[in-house]
């Protein structure tokens, strides 16, 4: 699958169902804890530096951001979870917004769950993965920040994450580095069956 990086736009930032875009395109949602690198991942996948706004401040994305990717699919950037400085009320609001999207949106075909390859999955990562499995949502786990791990230890870290998430054998896990930028095609190939 090839995408034209010049044909990508943020369609809408939504907080509730009646704001979701009316479209026939399949949607791929990106979930992960705050600061796992969702925006950086989107930018590197589409070959654009600042399409999805990256921030040094975790918990910055507070809406569901719908990006039309070359009229082929829509990436939905979901607010990061597990950020301590977001108030309890705000966290509950995010939770409801994410739940409404994941359980009601028929266009949703796949969730890419991003986890940090350097660390064990957090309790929130495990809860999110189990939540997706509970609703039978196809899930692709991407382990970010691969460049921060010595090459010889990458497989060990992947195996650890797979075990701790108690991953469904049908789900795929891939390590990724937005800096090395060498696995986009592999990931597009994994996404493609869900959107065609």
Swiss-Prot record:
GO terms for cellular component: cytosol. Pfam families: MMR_HSR1. One of its GO terms (biological process) is division septum assembly. It comes from Staphylococcus aureus (strain MRSA252). Its cofactor is Mg(2+). GTP binds at residues 32-39, 59-63, 77-80, 144-147, 176-178. SUPFAM superfamilies: P-loop containing nucleoside triphosphate hydrolases (SSF52540). CDD domains: YihA_EngB. This is Probable GTP-binding protein EngB. Residues 24-196 form the EngB-type G domain. InterPro entries: G_ENGB_dom (IPR030393), GTP-bd (IPR006073), GTP-bd_ribosome_bio_YsxC (IPR019987), P-loop_NTPase (IPR027417).
